[in-house]
């Protein structure tokens, strides 16, 4: 592997390598050839230290956007101004000392011309961006007077909160479930609008492995013989993790990338497997079939650590001991509630009889006789039946992956040592994302690549998490009152219908006011034209943010939140490292901006709920930290402040080590007998699709075989950008030197057929909307597949917006926005 990689590198550089450059540079320096670099000190005056230079202070900081990395920053301040940022240092984890261009350019965000400087009131047409300056007293008074009026007339659920993820900190953030904004919502009894993003893939892990972290820690990376990055470009979207893979590759492991385009991480891989968009689940099923065909499945692991031996009756329910005449018992769960205990049955080959699964010596996974009058099948039999149609030929036809590559993947996952899989959210962003993710999970289980060092998934570095959410939300007032709780849940896909119709599930449900913080929903949610209509239909909108982004333009009242470096806070929601991070206040808030924490408390006071917010920042943070892990380890905010970071290894290095999962049976699950949708909008649901992990169906629009592709032949991947997190950093001008404007990467053969050349303006369109951008010819693109960086504001596009081409409908049972499941046609302008 090493020789092959070195040979390819030599070819790519025509023999000119970093080592040869260094040797050549050394030789040239020795002969004086590098004149501009050689020492010439004879004519230089001795430099004297600058007198009276301002002292540089370094403060602890954290990058708090929702890229998920949670990078630790040193914030350099001189004369009360932020002058630079550098990577912070973890004494007990230097492998996480990382900073990216976004972290390095934070000072430009602090001093951005786009900063909201003072509270403002809309004076023009909504969306036109015409505002007048008002005072904080006026802003809080107008907001709370309106809210009280709506509550008196329509009830507290007429006010809807959207908790954004643009500031993932406990005091000022929206997204952390126990944030102060979430507490304000609970105290008021308002409605909560769920963003419904990035749900499908994590939900697949919960369904099959149980709740909580499902991935191995970074320390386990060196134990893998192969690393498979499936459905993403970690070099852009997961910078904290990427260097571990590259170091492991350099140490001898194989790096495999399965993706829909040849991107940065694919260029670093030993083996790149291109797959048609949204067909990853089909590929996994084809690989499973080949494994079973070759009898390579991990029989002992499947028998002992999964529910593969469990028996399913013809009615789709588990065969349980009660079916054999054994009365169920009861037990008390962790919440103090009584639960019925009726164990699932397996056929014990040693005993030659049906027994409770926990009592079996050797559970059967093949044919099982009729038991107590019930015809049954093992889950393993069902897996074999489900993958039978996925022959090498059929799988290759659907996915575009060659039969040889499918066979190679089957061999790699079962015959070539430990395989660790990093399943990225590329799979998540399609309407069939939940099914594709479960199919890949099934592959890992059938191959036995779970629960041991060097195997399993990467799902984010296990860490402290979001803290004691319930304690934060249910903290009584100073008079002993308890918060009302969330008044109602509204899914994003249903929000426009609820607002425009005044009904929810056929019942009256007026929503009049909308409050969003730390978010840019107009740019970041799907089907932008509908979002704009929603914003116009609402009576009263309050937006709290740092900048004049696309959503700010639609506000009735704008509240200026200060930058992260202008206040103190605790970074809690992140996936890139195992640390709690303390963000010190480095400078005073600029202009009239205020910390989000302070704004939430002002709104609470104005609403008459001040008694619920009579706590200091430290008191609230200590409540957040009072989890069982926090209590056991004596974690307080003062302890975090000792070094401004605190390592929290809340999970073992290897998830499910020894094959012990977090499900009720302690086994990994392939089947759920009574699944339920995770949202309710009155939709029709075929629950048969949701029961079994081997169910797969094509994507709604991205699938090549969909008839819609005759009218709209291209699909768009709206990918992450290096220089932005969602739309944050849009206001950093020198980042635009790297990604200056919206572009569309298109395969040169597709471009030639349409008469498109590099730099041409092209219009992507469908029945929902359109966007105009510049064409970039890229041979790394598959035919009929486009890639467009997705973090530009609407006003940065030539015309339209990528978000206008997407749809806002969910999978029947999974509340997940499908950013990539989008078909368009192309017009050259």
Where are these regions (language model features)?
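Extended redox/cofactor-interaction regions of prokaryotic respiratory oxidoreductases
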Residues: 2-5, 175-257, 282, 350-351, ...
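Glycine-rich phosphate/diphosphate-binding loops that line cofactor/substrate pockets in enzymes
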Residues: 140-159, 217-225, 386-387, 407-420, ...
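N-terminal export/assembly segments and adjacent metallocofactor-ligating motifs
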Residues: 2-300, 304-364, 375-376, 393, ...
């Amino acid at each position: 592997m090493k020789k092959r990689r070195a040979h390819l590198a030599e070819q790519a550089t025509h023999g000119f390598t970093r080592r040869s450059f260094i040797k050549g540079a050394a030789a040239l320096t020795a002969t004086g050839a590098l004149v501009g670099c050689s020492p010439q000190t004879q004519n230089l005056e001795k430099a004297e230290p600058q007198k009276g230079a301002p002292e540089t202070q370094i403060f602890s900081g954290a990058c708090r956007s929702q890229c998920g990395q949670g990078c630790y920053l040193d914030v350099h301040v001189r004369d009360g101004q932020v002058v630079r940022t550098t990577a912070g240092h973890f004494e007990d984890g230097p492998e996480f000392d990382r900073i990216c261009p976004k972290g390095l350019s934070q000072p430009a965000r602090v001093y951005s011309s786009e900063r909201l400087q003072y509270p403002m009131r809309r004076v023009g047409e909504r969306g036109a961006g015409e505002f007048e300056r008002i005072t904080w007293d006026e802003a809080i008074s107008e907001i709370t007077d309106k809210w009280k009026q709506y509550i008196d007339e329509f009830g507290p659920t007429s006010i809807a909160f959207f908790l954004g993820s643009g500031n993932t900190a406990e005091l000022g953030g929206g997204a952390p479930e126990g944030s102060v904004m979430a507490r304000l919502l609970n105290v008021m009894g308002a409605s909560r609008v769920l963003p419904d993003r990035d749900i499908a893939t994590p939900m697949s892990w919960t369904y099959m492995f149980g709740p909580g972290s499902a991935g191995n820690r970074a320390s386990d990376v060196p134990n893998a013989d192969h690393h498979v990055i499936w459905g993403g470009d970690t070099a852009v979207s997961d910078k904290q993790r990427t260097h571990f893979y590259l170091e492991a590759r350099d140490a001898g492991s194989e790096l495999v990338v399965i993706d829909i385009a040849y991107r940065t991480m694919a260029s670093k891989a030993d083996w790149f497997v291109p797959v048609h968009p949204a067909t990853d689940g089909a590929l996994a099923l084809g690989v499973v079939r080949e494994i079973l065909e070759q009898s390579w499945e991990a029989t002992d692991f499947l028998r002992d650590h999964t529910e593969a031996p469990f028996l399913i009756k013809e009615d789709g329910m588990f065969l349980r001991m009660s079916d054999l005449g054994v009365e169920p018992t009861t037990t008390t769960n962790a919440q103090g509630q009584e639960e019925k205990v009726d164990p699932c049955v397996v056929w014990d080959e040693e005993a030659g009889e049906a027994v409770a699964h926990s009592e079996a010596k050797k559970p059967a996974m093949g044919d099982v006789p009729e038991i107590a009058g019930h015809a049954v099948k093992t889950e393993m039999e069902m897996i074999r039946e489900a993958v039978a149609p996925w022959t090498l030929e059929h799988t290759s036809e659907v996915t575009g992956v060659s039969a040889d590559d499918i066979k190679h993947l089957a061999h790699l996952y079962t015959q070539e040592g430990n395989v660790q899989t990093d399943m990225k959210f590329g799979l998540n962003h399609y309407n069939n994302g939940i099914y594709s993710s479960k199919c890949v999970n099934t592959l890992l289980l059938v191959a036995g690549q779970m629960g041991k060092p060097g195997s399993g998934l990467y799902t984010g570095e296990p860490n402290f998490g979001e803290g004691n959410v319930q304690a934060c939300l249910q903290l009584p007032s100073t008079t002993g009152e308890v918060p009302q709780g969330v008044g109602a849940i509204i899914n994003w896909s249903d929000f426009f219908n609820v607002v425009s119709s005044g009904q929810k599930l056929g019942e009256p449900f007026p929503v009049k006011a909308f409050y969003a913080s730390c978010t840019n929903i107009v740019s970041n949610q799907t089907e932008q034209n509908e979002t704009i209509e929603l914003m116009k239909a609402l009576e009263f909108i309050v937006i709290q943010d740092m900048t004049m982004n696309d959503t700010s333009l639609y506000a009735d009242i704008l509240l200026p939140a200060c930058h992260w470096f202008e206040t103190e806070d605790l970074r809690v929601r992140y996936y890139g490292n195992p640390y709690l991070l303390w963000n010190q206040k480095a400078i005073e808030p600029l202009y009239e901006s205020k910390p989000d924490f302070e704004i939430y408390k002002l709104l609470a006071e104005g609403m008459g709920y001040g008694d619920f917010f009579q706590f200091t920042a430290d008191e609230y943070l200590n409540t957040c930290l009072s989890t069982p892990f926090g209590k056991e380890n004596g974690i307080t905010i003062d302890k975090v402040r000792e070094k401004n970071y605190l390592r929290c290894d809340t999970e073992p290095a290897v998830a499910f080590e020894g094959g012990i999962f977090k499900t009720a049976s302690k086994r990994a699950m392939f089947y759920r007998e009574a699944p339920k949708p995770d949202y309710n909008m009155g939709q029709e649901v075929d629950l048969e699709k949701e029961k079994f992990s081997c169910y797969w169906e094509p994507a709604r629009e991205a699938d090549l075989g969909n008839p819609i592709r005759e009218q709209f032949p291209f699909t768009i991947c709206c990918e992450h950008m290096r220089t932005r997190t969602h739309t944050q950093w849009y206001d950093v001008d020198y980042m635009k030197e790297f990604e200056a404007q919206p572009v569309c990467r298109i395969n040169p053969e597709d471009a030639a057929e349409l008469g498109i050349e590099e730099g041409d303006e092209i219009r992507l369109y469908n029945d929902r909307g359109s966007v105009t951008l510049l064409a970039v010819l890229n041979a790394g693109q598959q035919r009929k597949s486009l890639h467009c960086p997705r973090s530009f504001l609407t006003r940065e596009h030539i015309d339209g917006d990528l978000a206008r081409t997407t749809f806002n409908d969910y999978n029947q049972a999974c509340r997940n926005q499908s950013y990539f499941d989008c078909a368009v046609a192309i017009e050259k302008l």
